[in-house]
Amino acid sequence: MNKRSLLFVSLIGIAFVGCQIFFGYNDFRSCRTLTEKQKTITEQVLAATKSMGLSVSPWTTSLEEETNKNHYAVRVGDKLLLLNQGGSASSVYSSGVRWNFIEETTACDNIHVALYGEANETTTPSNMGKVFLPVTNEDLPVLVVEFRNNQEPVVFLGQYKQEQGKVYNKDSAVYGTSLVFWRSGNEYLPLGIYNSKEERLESLDLPITKAAVFSDSKSANAGANSAQYFVLSNEYMQLIVSQESGSIEGINLPFSSEDNKSIVNEIGFDRELKAQVPSEASFPGLPSVGANNQPVSDTVGGYYPLLRRGILSDAKKRTPSSYHALNIVSGRELTNSVASGYRVSTFNSTMLELESNDGSIKKTYKLPQQQPYAFEVEVGVNRASDDLWITSGIPEVEIMSNAFTPAIKYHVIKKNKGQLDKVKLPKAKDPLALRSGVYPQWILNSNGYFGIILSPLTDIPAGYAASYVPGSSVPTRLSLLSPKNQAYPASKYPGYETLLPLPQKEGTHRFLVYAGPLADPTLRVLDKAYTNSKGESPQYLDCITFRGFFAFITEPFAALLFIIMKFFRMITGSWGISIILLTVFLKLLLYPLNAWSIRSMRRMQKLSPYIQEIQQKYKKEPKRAQMEVMALYKTNKVNPITGCLPLLIQLPFLIVMFDLLKSSFLLRGASFIPGWIDNLTAPDVLFSWTTPVWFLGNEFHLLPILLGIVMFAQQKISASKKKGPATDQQRQQETMGTMMALLFTFMFYNFPSGLNIYWFSSMLLGLIQQWFTNKILDSKHLKNEISVNKKKQR
């Protein structure tokens, strides 16, 4: 090799070594810079988390030993978490404090995570229950404590990708085994341990590390890990609480059975929905867990959904969380949820406590066992605001006498007396109605037979709000029935929501919520339970008001008739029979008046030939003929309108019964003849078909047909006793009778079966009474004498 070649090789070697030294030094500087940066970040993060009870410190097995810089522990509140290779010591020392061993669990790569508590603790911490992470497609912010061999742990804020189960750090990769924490309010909760080799976050089975990890298949509660809803239930109701909104997505009332104390009966809509769309008649209907942290299995049927749930099978058509019950909202339209994403801190059979991820809202639902269809909610607000409202939720649709009858009312104290005022329902053009200057004792959002009463137990500002929600935004379950025929289009049934304001300061606000039937037995119990020491009752019974144009007149009488019906129901055990017995009772009560009317009609029939003579005699003098006829009526004590009297007598009772059936929840779902008359507040159904027919719909109702036949027969029996040719007036009466029979048949075709039973029974008893009275009068000729020109005539 010549000198030139040797010089070239030497220069290349020197350049290579120089490059190695240069890049090595740069790597060293970069590594050192990164280490310093990580140390700075660690110090900054720990400084910020110290006030929240999270810190990192070395630990040793005795106070005499020199602090081992290779062993570090994470302090979370009054607990200590440390990693080891197993065989945890019974006690350790950290920050000059003795910590006693509580429990240990095996994590990834045979690494053990041990839990220690302060030495002065005398009890072992109980399992605090699952803490469910908010379900979101976005990365979840977490705090990571990364343990590296023979180095002080690195602490940084990272991101947790729920779908992949990975933890990310924007500055560098996560190399070492790490403990991951999730901030909830003003504290950090242990979320799990991150396996950097498999890039997977795994949960830890320790009392204070019960946060759910959705991608962890090894979790003891894997079924609960995907839960989005929590079920709190008793014998009266099933509450479905949303993890996203922290509010109530569903209030399901069980049908009456031997296993519960509910008074809600199954009706035709429930059976049809279960048969046509069973997935939409399932309860809870959404992935849920109970107080035991186990998934709650769906059941098809068995419940009445008091709140609109939307279309469960279509996530886009479910009821938006802003319309959930007991949601905290704000904004111009009062539809913006204040907080989104909640964790559970306490969950047992009677109480569910949640806190929003940002710590601004805390809710506690308490479900008493003895108060029917009632529960309490405590709302803790940790930030002052002048625009916070609590919602009632939107009741499901009830069809009453073939009509949709929502109502909003509020109860106030005026002149030391309770008063129930009705709220005019808002319209689509002006969907939000705000009222100030009023202090409601409670506010009712009703669909007819059911209602949601929101009653503040602590002081709140004056005012209330009522909101109109388009039916397409919160579709009713009825829209799923016969969708091809558009029997119950969602747009036809808008929703209505009530709201109460919250105080403009931090604090805890309590509310009593009644969510159930507007029935005397349950509301009376609630009134008694919440009567104060002064004997002042909240007067929830005022919710039961009679509906109708003449309710202000019929209400006292309807209340009296219902008392009589309840007496007959107590004797017979059947509401249908009690309606018939009530009809018999009223017929006996009015027997003298009806008998007088029938006798008067018989006298009219006897006078018919003489009236014809007068009309023929004074054919050219109609006024004289009219005067003579009236004199004849007066002489024989006959009134021409007595023929209409039996029907006129019955009309007030008919109106009262109509109002009674629309206002008495106990008759809803009450069966009389199974398979035919299954609900006294709905039309009877002898049979049905698929394609609707004009007027008849897709159901055949027999009771109105029978009613028309009886009315026609009564008119015929009345006409059969007339002698001689019929007068014009009599022919008009016969025509009117036939028309009335047809009119009542058509008018009553879609009326409640209970009303048809009453009217049919009344007409049938009237027919029997008329036949019986005619027989008696025929056997007593002297009683049928008439006078013409002051002479006795037969």
UniProtKB/Swiss-Prot annotation:
GO terms for biological process: protein insertion into membrane; protein transport. GO terms for molecular function: membrane insertase activity. The chain crosses the membrane at residues 449-469, 548-568, 570-590, 641-661, 693-713, 740-760. A lipid is attached at C19 (S-diacylglycerol cysteine). Residues 1-18 form the signal peptide. Its main location: membrane. Pfam families: 60KD_IMP (PF02096). It is a multi-pass membrane protein. GO terms for cellular component: plasma membrane. PROSITE patterns: PROKAR_LIPOPROTEIN (PS51257). Interacts with the Sec translocase complex via SecD. Specifically interacts with transmembrane segments of nascent integral membrane proteins during membrane integration. Belongs to the OXA1/ALB3/YidC family. Type 1 subfamily. This is Membrane protein insertase YidC. It comes from Chlamydia caviae (strain ATCC VR-813 / DSM 19441 / 03DC25 / GPIC).
